[in-house]
Regions:
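Residue-level signature of mid-helix packing/kink "hotspots" within the transmembrane helices
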Residues: 57-65, 154-155, 274-282, 338
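Juxtamembrane intracellular "pre-TM" segments in multi-pass secondary transporters
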Residues: 1-11, 195-229
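Cytoplasmic membrane-interface "Motif A"-like loop-to-helix N-cap segments
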Residues: 73-84, 289-303
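Intracellular juxtamembrane helix-capping segments at the cytosolic ends
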Residues: 120-133, 338-352
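C-terminal ends and interior cores of transmembrane alpha-helices
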Residues: 85-101, 303-319
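Extracytoplasmic gate region of multi-pass secondary transporters
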Residues: 31-36, 224-270
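Helix-to-loop junctions at the C-terminal end of transmembrane segments
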Residues: 64-75, 280-293
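Cytoplasmic helix-loop-helix junction between adjacent transmembrane helices
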Residues: 110-148
Length: 363
């Protein structure tokens, strides 16, 4: 197994770090496929449920923007630990205080703040990858990184709650996320190495702020990075939008919902998106290292995702509660999503030496 990972470009010093990412993201993904339905069932509107995830995404974007530069400035492991501890602390407040209070502004605020944590954890690790892995193997290693990410947030993060929720209920299922996030944090502390280079050492506060600002200014100064960032945004609209709208569409009668699947059935259908990514994230990384990076994203990413998104809506309309056909749609979406797995690799190479963190912040 170790030799196989090394052939994929994963150095031994980072192997347990990849595992930490998978375990931590299992906790982060626990509520992804049923939070919007849970909120509607608690008496909130569909718009309020959607806004909750939208604002979470905005704060996650802020965390992602700062992650790369902070990791280069202060050390990736330090930023990963901060992000993980932030996530755990806010999650405790969200579950223990906000949800029981049923005060929507409090729920919205705490859930949004939690969104800062996980990008600091995972994207700081990508900075370490860029420093420890040669450019010729970086696409393959990045593909494996997204495989670990998908294993956590999508496979275990979708399938485990689908079996836990019928037994313990939706609210108690939220709490099962904590052990995974805590274990991932401990593994980060014990096994993730320090940066080879920490840019913030010896810099004044003014110079540090200037370095941090590069995560935004690079979008202006480097047109290729801007284009990659726009592609990333469009790609993620489906991956994070469908878990919000599809449970309302497939499992309720709210706002035109057709209510043909149970919530746990929907969770298992969506989980197939990420089961596929376990294979195709690594495959596309290997494939692009050998045959080029851009054209697979164009044809297997953009085009295939377009087909998958349309299929998710029309298959229930045409075939009813046909789980097998929905799984086929999930597989199509998974294959298309994976075709973008090397996008951060392309961005770091476009950025040039010493600006990988800024490029990943834009990502």
């Amino acid at each position: 197994m170790i030799r196989l990972l090394e052939r994929l470009g994963v150095p031994r010093v980072l192997m347990l770090g990849f595992l930490a990412v998978a375990i931590f993201m299992t906790g982060d993904g626990f509520e992804l496929t049923f939070l919007s339905k849970f909120m509607v069932d608690q008496g909130f509107t569909s718009s309020q449920a959607s806004l909750l995830v939208t604002v979470y995404g905005l704060f996650a974007a802020a965390g992602g923007w700062s992650a790369g530069m902070l990791a280069e400035m202060f050390g990736a492991r330090r930023v990963m630990m901060f992000g993980a501890c932030w996530w755990i602390g806010i999650h405790l407040l969200f579950l223990g205080v906000a949800i029981p209070s049923r005060i929507y502004p409090l729920i919205l605020g705490l859930y949004a703040l939690r969104g800062i944590g996980y990008p600091l954890f995972i994207y700081s690790f990508v900075v370490l990858m860029a420093q420890h892995i040669s450019p010729s193997r970086l696409a393959s290693a990045t593909g494996f990184f997204w495989t670990c990410f998908s294993l956590g947030i999508g496979v275990f993060g979708a399938y485990l709650p689908s079996f836990i929720m019928p037994v313990f209920g939706e609210y108690r299922t939220f709490w099962f996320a904590l052990p995974f996030s805590i274990v991932g944090t401990i593994m980060c502390f014990l096994f993730v190495p320090k940066n080879k280079v920490v840019k913030g050492e010896g810099l004044s506060r003014k110079e540090q702020l200037k370095e941090l600002a590069e995560g935004a200014t690079i979008l202006v100064t480097n047109r290729k990075i801007l284009i990659c960032a726009i592609i990333r945004i469009i790609n993620n609209l489906l991956l994070y939008g469908f878990p919000v709208i599809m449970p309302l569409y497939l499992c309720t009668t709210h706002n035109g919902g057709i209510n043909i699947f149970k919530t746990e059935e929907w969770m298992r259908i969506w989980g197939f998106v990420f089961v596929v990514t376990l294979i195709f994230n690594t495959f596309w990384g290997w494939f692009m290292d050998r045959f080029g990076w851009v054209w697979p994203m164009r044809w297997f990413g953009c085009a295939v995702l377009a087909v998958g998104s349309v299929a998710f809506y029309y298959i229930p309309q045409w075939f009813g509660a046909n789980a097998l056909m929905m799984i086929v749609a999930s597989i199509i979406v998974g294959i298309g999503t994976c075709a973008f797995s090397s996008l951060p690799t392309i961005m770091t190479l476009y950025a040039g030496e010493g600006k990988q963190g800024a490029a990943l912040s834009a990502y």
